[in-house]
Regions:
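Short hydrophobic alpha-helices at membrane interfaces in multi-pass membrane enzymes
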Residues: 3-19, 48-61, 120-132
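Transmembrane-embedded, aromatic-rich helix segments that form part
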Residues: 27-39, 72-75, 147-153
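Transmembrane alpha-helix segments characteristic
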Residues: 126-134, 189-192, 408-415, 427-449
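Hydrophobic/aromatic-rich transmembrane helices and adjacent perimembrane loops
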Residues: 151-152, 455-466
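Internal/C-terminal transmembrane anchor helices
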Residues: 176-201
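Lumenal/periplasmic acceptor-binding loop at the mouth of the active site in multi-pass
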Residues: 204-421
């Protein structure tokens, strides 16, 4: 199928399904690395490890283009048009968004037409760059920096796609009309799939009883899509649960240090029916800045401090803290304790345990908080279970006879590992299939970055309260 004429239509179908999946769950984007590997192995019979790594890097760029580019970019550029037409030209609400949608559709159609006919390489490049710009892909970040980054990216892309430059570079690095046409069609399908979010605006406009964030315009839709109601969590760098807010002395008073995350636009309430529609700018989300920070903070919530200590024997280390001119010592977890909690709770208890329930066995279906008698994974093999959770024969009858109790003696796990290694070392095609499945299911390392962007998914797994 991959070598047949018009086989690119399957790639375009995948792009459409990707656009639809954005409206379901952004973690669906993590299928793209596996799909790119399938494409690479189909197109390259003598695939190499180097080529596989390059394909994976390309897939990461693809994921980033959708996650950091198209998803927030459409809302961002649409917001610029909305401000121009409503605040600048005095038109009604959503008029700028309507114009933006029309221009985006026209640019996509023009780009597909130019890349299909190949009549003029300059027009083909211009239509492609215009489409990318209207999608907001180059405008990464917030505020003026996003505009500067966008201009630089557009300029670099324009220089690279210039017909004179394309004629001089090596053939393998040229962007062919077919590649550009396929890219534009895929982008069009992603946008069509992504447009399923229009239902959110339509539903909110009807003022239904459940109307969270009330996303009735492009700006409130942006807040809804970024899940601002769920707040933020430190991912790569931030405070620990015992960190103190940084203090500044101003006019003889201690003032907590705060940072403002941009600004937002909201509809202005009319004082009379004759007043024109307009948006007003309000301060964005205000967050406290902390004096003690660490890399990859897993134990960050001050309200869960006692529960953290149930999982890790926290000794910590003392860090000096300027409390308005008075130096005091603050004890925060060290990096090893932080990583230990990550492995013992977030990976082992909240990830590996669920996995082993299905491939080794389950003790019972009682919600556990780390106790040896509630909800652990077991094998059914006594000497292994004794090492993991103690002698199961000593449990009371109500736990032994729990309906959630299942033991598989690790047979599914053993059979899976046998199949995995057989597939990996059976042939070249087998090792290719192995890596495809590996990257399709091994998405845990990518969960945290994607979850932080969506702000709705599980970022730092919440601790049980019981």
């Amino acid at each position: 199928v991959a070598d047949q004429p018009h086989s690119d239509r399957w790639i375009i179908l995948i792009a459409y399904l990707t656009g639809l999946s954005i409206g379901v769950h952004l973690l669906n984007l993590l299928c793209l690395p596996a799909i790119v590997l399938v494409y690479y192995y189909k197109k390259t019979p003598n695939a190499t490890a180097k080529g596989s790594l390059i394909a994976l890097l390309g897939s990461m760029v693809l994921v980033a283009a959708v996650l950091y580019g198209i998803v927030p970019g459409i809302v961002k550029v649409g917001g610029w048009f909305e401000l121009l037409f409503v605040n600048g030209l005095g038109m009604s609400f959503n008029s700028g968004v309507v114009v933006y949608i029309i221009l985006l559709a026209a640019a996509l159609i023009w780009g597909v037409y130019e890349s299909y006919t190949e009549k003029n390489k300059a027009r083909m490049a211009i239509s492609f760059i215009l489409t990318i710009a209207l999608l907001g892909i180059p405008f990464y970040g917030h505020g003026a920096s996003s505009i500067i980054i966008g201009i630089l990216v557009i300029a670099a892309l324009g220089l690279y796609l210039a017909p004179s430059v394309q004629a001089k570079i090596k053939e393998r690095w040229r962007i062919t009309a077919r590649t550009m046409n396929t890219a534009l069609l895929c982008t069009m399908m992603i946008v069509i799939g992504y447009s399923s979010y229009a239902l959110i605006v339509i539903r909110s406009t009807a003022n239904t009883p459940m109307d969270q964030n009330s996303p009735e315009d492009i700006f409130t839709l942006g807040e809804y899509l970024s899940r601002e109601q769920y707040g933020t969590r430190p991912l790569f760098y931030g405070p620990a649960f015992s960190s103190k807010v940084a203090l500044d002395v101003k006019d003889g008073y201690c003032i907590p240090r705060q940072s403002e995350a941009g600004s937002k636009f909201v509809r202005k309430e009319k004082t009379s029916p004759d007043e024109k529609d307009s948006y007003i700018e309000l301060p964005g989300r205000v967050e406290y800045e902390y004096a003690q920070n660490m890399f990859f903070p897993r134990m960050y919530s001050s309200s869960h401090a006692p529960l953290y200590k149930q999982w890790v024997d926290i000794k910590g280390h003392d860090v000096p803290y300027d409390q308005c001119g008075e130096m005091v010592m603050v004890n925060i977890p060290n990096q090893w304790e932080n990583i230990k909690f990550f492995f013992s709770y977030q990976l082992n208890f909240m990830y590996w345990r669920y996995f082993m329930w299905n491939f080794a066995g389950r003790q019972n279906d009682i919600q556990g908080s780390g106790e040896i008698e509630h909800g652990n994974w077991i094998t059914g093999i006594p000497f292994i279970d004794n090492l993991l959770v103690g002698n199961q024969e000593l449990l009371p009858q109500d736990l032994k006879n729990n309906k959630g109790h299942n033991v598989f003696y690790c047979l599914p796990l053993i059979l899976g590992l046998i199949g995995l290694f057989w597939q990996a070392y059976h042939s070249q095609r087998g090792i290719q299939q192995f890596w495809v499945v590996f990257f399709l299911f091994l998405t845990k390392p990518l969960h945290n970055p994607v979850n932080e962007i969506t702000r709705m998914l599980v970022r730092s797994t919440p601790l049980p309260s019981g």
